[in-house]
Structures are given as C-alpha cells and as structure tokens.
Amino acid sequence: MIKTIIEFFSLLTPSQRRRFYTLQILLVIMTFAEVASIFSITPFMALVGDPSILQKEGFLRILYEKSNLDEPYKFIFYLGFVVLAILIISALISIFITWRLAMFATKIGVEIGDRLYSHYLNRDWLFHTMKSSSNLTEKISTETYRITHMFLLPLMYMNARLFLTLFVFLILLVYDPIVSIICLIVFSITYIIIIKLARARLEINSKNISAMFLERFKLMSDSFGGIKEVLLLDKSSEFKKSFIKAGNKLAYSEGLNRAIALVPRYFMELIGFASMIALVLYLIANSKGNLGLLLPILSIYAIAGVKLLPALQQIYNSIVTIQGNLSAYESIREDLININMDIEQKVEDNQQVWSKHNEISLKNITFNYPHKKSFALKDVSLVIKPNTTVGFVGTSGSGKSTLIDVIIGLIKPQQGEITIDGTPLISQNLRTWQNKIGIVPQVIFLTEGTISENVAFGIPQDLINHEQVKKVLKLAYLEEWVLGLENGVHSKVGERGIQLSGGQKQRIGIARALYYEADVLVFDEATSALDGITEKAIMRAINDFTGKKTLIMIAHRLTTVQKCDKIFMMNNGSIVDSGTYQQLLKKNEQFKKM
C-alpha cells in the first residue's frame, strides 16, 4: 500500500505536490493546537482539585504571582476562560485545516478526472477503436470519485491523526514511559492483527467493486443505446436481472468493506475503557489513600484517551478504506503514466498553410491493425486531383474505410507516404490538414441539443455563427424544413437525433461538414442506410459541390458513384482496378455485380 501511495504522488503535477506539502505543515500546526487543548485542561483540573498548588513551586505559581490577583479562586476563574479560549482556537484551527484537507482531496480528484478526459480525447482513432466508451466513462466518473473519497480523503485524515497520535504518545511517554509503552504495544498489535486478517478480503472486494461498477455502466450504455431493440425484443427483464445482480455484488463488497472498517471500533473501545479501569485501580492501589492526587493524573489519561481512541480508529479506518479501493487507482494507473509521457512528448503544429487546391498523393501505403495478422492496406498508391470527385467501392472488409482514415489523418500507416501538394503529411502539420476536411459518416452522431448546436458541433452556443448555420442548412436543402419548425434552428433534435428522420440526420451531417468551410468532403457510405428517394435527394445536395470541392465517396451501391470522375475498386486491402463508371462497367465483371 505504501509503494502505491508513493507512486500515486509521483504522478501528481508539481503544483499538486506543492499543495500537499503545504498541507503537511498545516497538519503540524493543527497537531500543536490539539495537543495544547488537551494538556491545557490538565493543570486547570489539578488546580480545581487542589488550590494549594498555587503555593508550591511551578509555572502555575509564577502565573498566579504575575496576575496580581489576591484570591486563588479569581485566578482559577480567569484561568478557566483562558483554557476555554485555547479550546476554541484549537477547534477553529482544526475546522479550517480539515476543510482545507477535504478541499484539497476533492480538487485533486476533479483534476485527475479532467486530465483523464483530456487524455482520452487526445488519443488517436486506433485507441478508441480498441477501448470501450463505457470503460472510459466509468474511469472518469466512478474511479476518480473513489480515488477522491476512498483514497485521497482517508489518506489526508490518516496523516492528520498520525501527527496527533505520535505527538500525544511522545508526551505520555515522557509523563509515564511504562504505561505508554504498554498501551502502544497492546493497541498496535491488535490493529496490525485485524489489518492482516482483513487485507486479502479487502483486495478481493476492491476488484469486485471496480468490476461491478464497470458492468453496470456497460449495461446502462447497452440498454439505453439500443432501447428500440430492447423494447421490441422484450429484453428489458434480462438487462434488469443483470443490472440487479451486479448491484447486489457491488453492495455486498462495499458493505463488507465498511463493516471491516467500522466494527473493530467497538472492540478497541472495550480495550481502551478496560485499560482506563485497570489504570484507575492501579493508581488507587498505589495512592496510599490520597485520592486527591489521582484527579490530575486521571485527567491527562482520560483526555488523551478521548483524543487517541478516535484518532487510532480514524487511522485504522483510513488504512482499510484505502486498501479496499486500491483497484480504483490500479484501473487508471497506466493512463496517469501515459498522461505524464504525453506532456513531455507534446508535438507543436507548425501551422502549415495548405493551398486551396489540394492534390492528395499516396505512395506505397501499408497498414495493419494491432493484433491482426492480415493487412488492412497493402502497398496502396493513388492520386486524387483537386476539386474532383472520386469513389471507392468494394466488398465489406476490402479496406475502403481504413484507406479514408489514412487520408484524413486518423490512422498513421506503418509504411508509405502521404503528400498534400507535394508536402509530406506529418504530425506537425496534421492538424491544419484536418481543419480542411469535412466528413459525413454513415451514422451521424447528434448531441441532445439544437439544430444549430449540432451543425456547429463542438462550439459553445454563444460563439455559434448563426448566419453560417443558415447558409449551410440551405446548401444541404434543409432551409425549408427548418423554417417550418416552431423554434427554427433552435429546435431540439432529441438524444442522438431521435426526433429526426434518416435523411434529415444525413443532411445535418452535410451541413456540419460545410459549416467549417471544408475544401475536402468525405462521404463514408453516407446514403447506404437510406431509401431510394431520400438517397437521390442527398445525392442532389452532394452533387452541387462537384467541381467546387474535392469529394471522396465510399459506397456499396453503384448509383452513388455514377458521377465520380474516378472510381477505385478495392479488394483485400489493395486497389485492384480504377477508372470511370463506364470504363469499369465495360472491363470489370466484379464491378458489374456490385
């Protein structure tokens, strides 16, 4: 556990570590304040029990003489107010520093979530094809919450109680070494035995909690994402059973962890009170009838016990809570390491200025996906002239979409070179190249926002250029439909565009690509899921840009690529033929069958 904590703090930012070290100084101040409050009561109680102490040698006599008070009881009265003031100041200091501890831990948790979110968004397309969005969401929302409330906060509180426990023990050690050492041995051995016995169960529960949180996230994502199929196929009961089953496992693991953390408290309180009774009996037996001497001694041990027992329980509780949630850190450990590496390796865009007329050239492009034996692309070479319309056809799995992902910079090939107007496409100029591209996929992702927010995707509402929105909606043949809506471009589209037809979604996708004034438009089977009439309407909108922009189209149906200047036919990751629509019809039998 200690190695994990050290590693975790090594992955924090320098600013976060500085804040942590500052808090340790505050914890020392809080410890002094609490110790002062504890041991200010002891001399006061001794004086109340025996006012004659003022006549004996000691610091109370010095204070009494300097106070110029003529009555011992007046001195005791004012001393009581001083002790009360010390207690109030100590409480205020503890409240403030405890608040700072909580704010630090929660702030760190939020910042870790922010870093993870930013890290995942900055990862390449291949990363997201191999990762579950439910898993990423669960890490950002649930695991960072666990790190905040079940890892960092307990750690902060444990540190606070450790400082107090050590300081009080040192004072008691000076006051009575034998009793202090005996108490230390008894309490330490008891807690160590409990922690050793509970460790294995806590580790199992920790992993179960992470697994069940992820399972419930996945079930929610799958059931809500496919709600139409769930309702139609009457599968809601199966999802509910799985969700409840995972929830019961989660509740059992979390409940058992809490019980392991809380139950020993009563056993330790029993030991604590038994020790106090034994101490009282021991002091009575050795007081020789002078019970008045016992009051200050009992006061110091009683007050120390009141502070130490909860402190020891807090330390134990924190250790158990941290051990029971180490899986939360383990689940994001690799990501935090990668984040630090990303910061060191960040690539600056050189702001390459591409010409308006972009000739796209691919030379000997080869690529295969991780953990796949066969090549997705194999020695592909082609040239796309500016402001031409090209199509890619082929059976499923022939490499069409992968090739487009290479052209638009989502995938980096293992071999070969891509050039734009003769300039190699590299990391430093990739961003500016992608700024010139608009893509219309087969399935248009729509947020649960307005039409204008979906057209100007990713732009805050107050920064949207509504004139540009209206312009591109007109180009996408959506103007008439939008004008017929009560709220126009401010109309909501529903979650994932559920209130729109397939054709309307595709047109919004086209408008989105045009909003950013892209010079290259990519249509990735954009009409394959549409009926014939709607497809013709969409193709009319697309064909309006012929000769004005570079159009790249992936298609299954040949009707989509009839007007292309050039068509590339693909099979098994290679270009097996190319030509115009009419040329391929004449010379390629496979093309005719498509």
Kindly give the residue locations of the regions a language model identified.
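Transmembrane helices of ABC transporter permease
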Residues: 23-29, 157-207, 278-293
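ABC ATPase nucleotide-binding domain helical subdomain, centered on the C-loop/LSGGQ "ABC signature"
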Residues: 419, 427, 434, 452-495, ...
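Helix-to-loop junction immediately C-terminal to a conserved catalytic motif
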Residues: 408
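Transmembrane helix-loop-helix hairpins at lipid-water interfaces of multipass membrane proteins
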Residues: 24-89, 172-180, 185, 289-295
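C-terminal portion of ABC ATPase nucleotide-binding domains
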Residues: 540, 557, 562-594
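A short, proline-enriched helix->beta-strand linker immediately N-terminal to the Walker B motif
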Residues: 515-519, 548
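Loop segments that connect adjacent transmembrane helices in multi-pass transporters
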Residues: 129-135, 208-256, 324, 331-332, ...
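Cytosolic ends of transmembrane helices, especially the final helix of ABC transmembrane type-1 domains
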Residues: 231-235, 259-262, 306-335
